[in-house]
From Swiss-Prot:
Was identified as a high-confidence drug target. The gene is PPE23. Pfam families: PPE, PPE-SVP. Belongs to the mycobacterial PPE family. This is Uncharacterized PPE family protein PPE23. InterPro entries: PPE_C (IPR022171), PPE_dom (IPR000030), PPE_sf (IPR038332). It comes from the Bacteria. GO terms for biological process: response to host immune response.
Length: 394
């Protein structure tokens, strides 16, 4: 059995953290166990057979690589935690009792990560040192076929040494075998000395306790007390409350309908009052128009009084207006008050009457406004037609 045989006795997949621990520990135990024995007392067949029959330095190198990976992960975690804590505390993004409590709990854990990463790196270096020691010892070890050939030659020389002729050859063969013995012993002792540091591993400390175990108990107690304080909620008649709530909603809907109906009645009343006011306004407008029509009728009655005076006649000469003979009254017709009143009372004739007062040439001639009196604007009621009297000529 060689020193590196115990490496595979754990049956752990290479590359895992457990393989690292098992591999290094097994090699250390194997070397420590054989260091108590005398490698010089063992023939070269045993020492060479052990060195050549094992898996070699492969498990040790795999363990070293696994330790390197674990150290890198621990170091990265420690760096990330430290950067996050530094950013939170230095930038003042989170300050107060909760922040202080978190920092006090995390900083010890960050320190543990850094320490464990360093120990993992040391374990990796020790595993690589053990692998290097094995390679050196393997190079010094006599190959088993050479030892077997020496033993075969010795047996042949001994069997054919009938007359002592093979004695010098037998001595030479025995001397070579002794050299093989010494060489294997030296290789094993050197391997044990070089691999001794792998037997001294710094123990890993468990991670610090960053939580308060009593706080969990206090939290459970507080929750239980809170449930006890609010146990009255179980005695509430939720079904009755739901029933009363539905009754309240129904009453609210009824009140809403009443308010809606009242609003409709109010709107109808306002529309009724508005209609009455509109009817009153129309009646007043009709009365004003009727009064205006009555004033016009009074004017026409005054117009009907024209010509009611006695007829007077006289014999005289006709007056001359140019080459035309005209009645004497045309030159200066008397302006009777009745004619002025009638002219002013009729809107269509008023302008003609005023023009007749200022005219000197044709005072007794019929005015054009009289002929246009029939074309006045339409009035409500019976339409009146007024015909002007023509004055007697001659």
């Amino acid at each position: 059995m060689t020193l590196d045989v115990p490496v595979n006795q754990g049956h752990v997949p290479p590359g895992s953290v457990a393989c690292c621990l098992v591999g290094v520990t097994a090699v250390a135990d194997g070397i420590a166990g054989h260091s108590l024995s005398n490698f010089g007392a063992l023939p070269p067949e045993i020492n060479s057979g052990r060195m050549y029959s094992g898996p070699g330095s492969g498990p040790l190198m795999a363990a070293a690589a696994a330790w390197d990976g674990l150290a890198a992960e621990l170091s990265s975690a420690a760096t990330g935690y430290g950067a996050a804590i530094s950013e939170l505390t230095n930038m003042r993004w989170w300050s107060g009792p909760a922040s202080d409590s978190m920092v006090a709990a995390v900083l010890p854990f960050v320190g543990w990560l850094s320490t464990t990463a360093t120990l993992a790196e040391q374990a990796a270096m020790q595993a690589r040192a053990a692998a290097a020691a094995f390679e050196a010892a393997f190079a010094m070890t006599v190959p088993p076929p050479a030892i077997a050939a020496n033993r075969t030659l010795l047996m042949t020389l001994v069997d054919t040494n009938w007359f002592g002729q093979n004695t010098p050859a037998i001595a030479t063969t025995e001397s070579q075998y002794a050299e093989m013995w010494a060489q294997d012993a030296a290789a094993m002792y050197g391997y044990a000395s070089a691999a001794a540091p792998a037997t001294v591993l710094t123990p890993f400390a468990p991670p610090p306790q960053t939580t308060n175990a009593t706080g969990l108990v206090g939290h459970a107690t507080a929750v239980a007390a809170l449930r006890g304080q609010h146990s009255w909620a179980a005695a509430i008649p939720w079904s009755d409350i739901q029933k009363y709530w539905m009754m309240f909603l129904g009453a609210l809907a009824t009140a809403e309908g009443f308010i809606y109906d009242s609003g409709g009645l109010t709107l109808n009343a306002l529309q009724f009052v508005g209609g009455m006011l509109w009817s009153t306004a129309l009646a007043e407008a009709g009365a004003a128009e009727a009064a205006a029509g009555a004033g016009g009728a009074a004017g026409w009655s005054a117009w009907s009084q024209l010509g009611a005076g006695p007829v007077a006649a006289s014999a005289t000469l006709a007056a001359k207006i140019g080459p035309m003979s005209v009645p004497p009254g045309w030159s200066a017709p008397p302006a009777t008050p009745q004619a002025q009143t009638v002219a002013r009372s009729i809107p269509g004739i008023r302008s003609a009457a005023e023009a007749a007062e200022t005219s000197v040439l044709l005072r007794g001639a019929p005015t054009p406004g009289r002929s246009r009196a029939a074309h006045m604007g339409r009035r409500y009621g019976r339409r009146l037609t007024v015909m002007a009297d023509r004055p007697n000529v001659g």
